[in-house]
């Protein structure tokens, strides 16, 4: 990696660490959302650097839908144990009672009940006034216009027309009782930055990001990896082993794989250099309707 690129990554690292420390000093009860993906892994690594040699001054929160890949759950628990992090796991009890699932109820309802409502329940339950998230501006157009400190009202709603200025890296974290801030320390990073930093810092990631032979089927223009037996095959569908990996991770019925032979970090980085599509092309929830991500964020989604 050339010196110019290395300096760029260190500048991003310094900015993110500054934001994380600022939130820890300014807010009474912050939390770090941990979705187990590559961005969460980088964000956790930066947080550990920010407070080294001490421990994290806030817990990790995973809003569990019950439909993550099995490798993600194993990685989550191993990571929390390895680093001695306090891990909070919340699953929407009403959604569980109604047996909400993406196959029967669709991606929009599943996401709203198990993710958005589940997140709001957890934030209310523990009284968190600031929540870190790993979203980046290059991922999606609604995230591109969101501030690093994203103000949310007492119902956790985001109003894109009522955002606060962030001049010269000065962040306004003043809130009233019941209000909160979502904080995005990786806002200025790109997917390429994330992968190069993972390689530079030797950060462990879920193996699903690396290409391997996996059982997949084609459905609705997406390569779906069959992770357990909760799927009913439709007429003509056949499960086949193919060399695939994931650019983004979520609930397995709603996350498409991509055909790839990139089995190492340098190979992934090389693959990203020639990619012309967004990593979120494989996320079914982004296809629900035009502007679906912004609508979800207005309702309280991260």
From Swiss-Prot:
Family per record: Belongs to the PAPS reductase family. CysD subfamily.
Leader sequence residues: none
Enzyme Commission number(s) of this protein: 2.7.7.4
Class in the EC hierarchy, top level: transferase
Disulfide bonds: none
Known function: With CysN forms the ATP sulfurylase (ATPS) that catalyzes the adenylation of sulfate producing adenosine 5'-phosphosulfate (APS) and diphosphate, the first enzymatic step in sulfur assimilation pathway. APS synthesis involves the formation of a high-energy phosphoric-sulfuric acid anhydride bond driven by GTP hydrolysis by CysN coupled to ATP hydrolysis by CysD.
Organism: Salmonella arizonae (strain ATCC BAA-731 / CDC346-86 / RSK2980)
The keyword Transferase belongs to this UniProt entry's keyword annotation: yes
Gene Ontology BP annotations: hydrogen sulfide biosynthetic process; sulfate assimilation
Protein name stated in the entry: Sulfate adenylyltransferase subunit 2
Pfam family, one: PAPS_reduct
UniProt keyword terms in alphabetical order: ATP-binding, Nucleotide-binding, Nucleotidyltransferase, Transferase
Domain of life: Bacteria
Entry annotated with the keyword Transferase: yes
């Amino acid at each position: 990696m050339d010196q110019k690129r290395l300096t760029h990554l260190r500048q991003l690292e310094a900015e993110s660490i500054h934001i994380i420390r600022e939130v820890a000093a300014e807010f009474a009860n912050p939390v770090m959302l941990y979705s187990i993906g590559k961005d969460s892994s980088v964000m956790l690594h930066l947080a550990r650097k920010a407070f080294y040699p001490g421990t994290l001054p806030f817990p990790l929160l995973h809003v569990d839908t019950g439909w993550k890949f099995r490798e993600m759950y194993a990685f989550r628990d191993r990571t929390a144990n390895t680093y001695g992090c306090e891990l909070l796991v919340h699953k929407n009890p009403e959604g569980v009672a109604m047996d909400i699932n993406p196959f029967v109820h669709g991606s929009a309802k599943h996401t709203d009940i198990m993710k958005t409502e589940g997140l709001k329940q957890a934030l209310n339950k523990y009284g968190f006034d600031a929540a870190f998230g790993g979203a980046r501006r290059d991922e999606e157009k609604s995230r591109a216009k969101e501030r690093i400190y994203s103000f949310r009202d007492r119902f956790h709603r985001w109003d894109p027309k009522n955002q606060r200025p962030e001049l010269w890296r000065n962040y306004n974290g003043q809130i009233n009782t019941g209000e909160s801030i979502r904080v995005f320390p990786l806002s200025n990073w790109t997917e390429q930055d994330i992968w190069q930093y993972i390689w530079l810092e030797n950060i462990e990631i879920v193996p699903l990001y690396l290409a391997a032979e996996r059982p997949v089927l084609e459905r609705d223009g997406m390569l779906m990896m069959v992770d357990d037996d909760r799927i009913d095959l439709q007429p003509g569908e056949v499960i086949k082993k193919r060399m695939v990996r994931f650019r983004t991770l979520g609930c397995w019925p709603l996350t498409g794989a991509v055909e790839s032979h990139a089995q190492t970090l340098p190979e992934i980085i090389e693959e990203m250099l020639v990619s012309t599509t967004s990593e979120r092309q494989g996320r079914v929830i982004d296809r629900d309707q035009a502007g679906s991500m912004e609508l979800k964020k207005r309702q309280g989604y991260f």
